[in-house]
Regions:
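Expand to "…catalyze enediolate/carbanion chemistry for C-C bond making/breaking, isomerization
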Residues: 1-92
Length: 92
């Protein structure tokens, strides 16, 4: 059985290079798709201080996945409640 590797996590652990990214706070999959092509290492979808709900997160994650680029998505949930984390995981 093969194990999935999180390349962003591995690169952060290695510490060999600076990693650059942006916060996505507009709730728009078109913006997420455009920024996926900008060459950032990571893109963080913010649910804490931005108007991103579960549907917005899912659509932005689909846009990032469809881009087939190395930008790794990260989601910041608005709290530590398990149901919030589960919703983000269910979104992708």
């Amino acid at each position: 059985m093969s194990t999935l590797t999180n390349s962003l996590k591995q690169r952060l652990h290695d510490g060999d290079e600076p990693l650059y990214g942006l916060w996505l706070s507009l709730g728009c999959e078109t913006v997420a798709e455009a920024l996926a092509h900008a060459g950032y290492d990571w893109l963080c979808i913010d649910m804490e201080h931005a108007p991103n709900d579960s549907r917005d997160v899912a659509s932005q994650l689909r846009a990032l996945a469809a881009a087939h680029l190395p930008s790794e998505p990260v989601v910041r949930v608005p709290g530590r409640e398990p149901w919030l984390v589960k919703r983000a995981l269910d979104a992708g």
